[in-house]
């Protein structure tokens, strides 16, 4: 029988779940989940910031990924995310932010969920998390381009 304990972050978890996760998830997932990179937000009002917000109704994961682009070069200078979901969703978001920083929009658009899933060794039941990350970067790029187009039309 699992007991409950309160962790330092005031989240109540069944005792033993972290040990279970460590046995079931690849160390890269554990690393990105426990030490997520680039968590935060960018000012969505800026014309060089694109925001992608996606969700998976089946499991309740929600992912927001934001990119800040150098308008003159089309290179992603900064990237932030906030994800509400399982460890695989958080790890996929965190890994995606590392992957796209410094890439051109064209190169970032080419990233497929299979690349994320392979790098993190996600099990088949967690592939939707890597799909969310792919959808989020594409949505952020689309948002950035629509903002830029609107600015150019003025």
Curated annotation (Swiss-Prot):
CDD domains per the UniProt record, alphabetical: IscU_like (cd06664)
SUPFAM superfamilies: SufE/NifU
Recorded superkingdom: Eukaryota
Cofactor binding summary note: Binds 1 [2Fe-2S] cluster per subunit.
Signal sequence range: none
InterPro entries reported for this sequence: ISCU, NIF_FeS_clus_asmbl_NifU_N
GO biological process, one term: intracellular iron ion homeostasis
Entry GO CC: cytoplasm; mitochondrial matrix
Cellular location(s): Mitochondrion matrix
Keywords attached to this entry: 2Fe-2S, Iron, Iron-sulfur, Metal-binding, Mitochondrion, Transit peptide
Cofactor(s) essential for the protein: [2Fe-2S] cluster
Main location class: mitochondrion
GO molecular-function terms, A-Z: 2 iron, 2 sulfur cluster binding; ferrous iron binding
Protein's pathway: Cofactor biosynthesis; iron-sulfur cluster biosynthesis
Pfam families: NifU_N
Binding partners and assembly: Component of the core Fe-S cluster (ISC) assembly machinery.
Record's function text: Scaffold protein for the de novo synthesis of iron-sulfur (Fe-S) clusters within mitochondria, which is required for maturation of both mitochondrial and cytoplasmic [2Fe-2S] and [4Fe-4S] proteins. First, a [2Fe-2S] cluster is transiently assembled on the scaffold protein ISU1. In a second step, the cluster is released from ISU1, transferred to a glutaredoxin, followed by the formation of mitochondrial [2Fe-2S] proteins, the synthesis of [4Fe-4S] clusters and their target-specific insertion into the recipient apoproteins.
Family membership: Belongs to the NifU family.
Full protein name: Iron sulfur cluster assembly protein 1, mitochondrial
